[in-house]
Amino acid sequence: MKTVLILLSILGMACALSMKNLNRRAKLEDSEENGVFKYRPQYYVYKHGYFYPALKRFAVQSSSDSSEENGNGDSSEEEEEEEETSNEEGNNGGNEDSDENEDEESEAENTTLSTTTLGYGEITPGTGDIGLAAIWLPRKAGATGKKATKEDESDEEEEEEEEEENEAEVDDNEQGINGTSSNSTEVDNGHGSSGGDNGEEDGEEESVTEANTEGITVAGETTTSPNGGFKPTTPHQEVYGTTPPPFGKITTPGEYEQTGTNEYDNGYEIYESENGDPRGDNYRAYEDEYSYYKGRGYDSYDGQDYYSHQ
């Protein structure tokens, strides 16, 4: 019992001291001096819980939890999944369906991805205003390999057909130039083409070429001249706007435009009137002296010899 009483007394004293210290701190913190010079902010749990909630509550700072912001993203993902499933179904279908789809896709790619560069503001003929329709999803390696092999085979077949058509056109042109084909002569004769027939054909070709050359010379009326086949030509008067003078005639100054013909006009720009102040110095202040000494010699002054009467 004694030990229990001793422990209780010790606990009471400790609690009393702690309460005194708390009361003193409360009184000191309420004073103006401690509020200014000894500010001790008290941290409480409810402040953190109230002023700093989880970021999900703020719509601005949310990254991927709000359904409003990611509505477009979810729809785009669904569209991509639908496209992938449709493509897989098309690939798993029959060979005819796959070939038709590949042809349509190749045509669409050719229309959407045009190689020509257009000017500013122009719209490509394939894309237009279709948004993201020109973007294609990547296919599997096996499908691309099959597609490449089929395209190579189709290209080779097209090249062979073009070569055959070109050869047929060349044969037709040769037959048209020669007039009559060798096959027709063989059928008519029954025993092959003879030398006389060939000679007649050669003669006809020569006559045709001679007639062509004669027609060209008559229509062209070519004439020879000592200057290597070229004639000296004079340009039309309308080209230069002026008539050239005849050969051997010398032009007079009156035929050209003359400036500064006026008494006071020295070719400067004139303001307000014909005899206005021009730009620059024309020595108008010395006009009287110049006119007075104009007809006199350098050695005379007032009609007398300057050096003899000195």
From Swiss-Prot:
Domain description: The Arg-Gly-Asp (RGD) sequence serves as an integrin-binding motif and is required for integrin-mediated cell attachment.
Region called Disordered, residue ranges: 61-284
Listed name of the protein: Integrin-binding sialoprotein
Biased composition (Acidic residues): 75-87, 96-108, 152-174, 198-208
Misc note: It is possible that the segments of clustered carboxyl groups mediate the strong binding to hydroxyapatite.
Chain span(s) of sequence motif Integrin-binding motif: 279-281
UniProt xrefs under InterPro entries: IBSP
Modification sites for Sulfotyrosine: Y306, Y307
Positions of modified residues (Phosphoserine): S31, S62, S67, S75, S76, S98, S106, S154, S273, S300
Species, as recorded: Bos taurus (Bovine)
Lineage: Eukaryota, Metazoa, Chordata, Craniata, Vertebrata
Glycosylation sites: N110, N178, N183
Keywords from the UniProt entry: Biomineralization, Cell adhesion, Glycoprotein, Phosphoprotein, Secreted, Sialic acid, Signal, Sulfation
Gene Ontology annotations for the cellular component aspect, listed alphabetically: extracellular space; vesicle
Glycoprotein in keyword set: yes
Pfam families, sorted: BSP_II (PF05432)
Bias (Polar residues): 175-187, 209-227
Composition-biased stretches (Low complexity): 62-74
Gene that encodes it: IBSP
Signal peptide, first to last residue: 1-16
Transmembrane regions: none
Location(s) in or outside the cell: Secreted
Primary location group: secreted
Function of the protein: Binds tightly to hydroxyapatite. Appears to form an integral part of the mineralized matrix. Probably important to cell-matrix interaction. Promotes adhesion and migration of various cells via the alpha-V/beta-3 integrin receptor (ITGAV:ITGB3).
